[in-house]
Amino acid sequence: MDKNLLKYIYTVPVISTLWLLLTAGILIEINRFYPDALFYAF
């Protein structure tokens, strides 16, 4: 296997997990300060 491919396979799950945690945290904080914002039509 190519060394770059192995590095890609091992780093993508870590980066995607961190990205999902960051996105969820941002949504949770927005929902905490503006609880009705998810129901308004922007």
UniProtKB/Swiss-Prot annotation:
It is found in: Plastid, Chloroplast thylakoid membrane. Signal peptide: none annotated. The keyword Translocase does not apply. GO terms for biological process: photosynthesis. It comes from the Eukaryota. The chain crosses the membrane at residues 8-28. It is a single-pass membrane protein. Keywords: Chloroplast, Membrane, Photosynthesis, Photosystem I, Plastid, Thylakoid, Transmembrane, Transmembrane helix. GO terms for cellular component: chloroplast thylakoid membrane; photosystem I. InterPro entries: PSI_PsaJ, PSI_PsaJ_sf. Belongs to the PsaJ family. May help in the organization of the PsaE and PsaF subunits. This is Photosystem I reaction center subunit IX. It comes from Cyanidium caldarium (Red alga). The lineage of its organism: Eukaryota, Rhodophyta, Bangiophyceae, Cyanidiales, Cyanidiaceae.
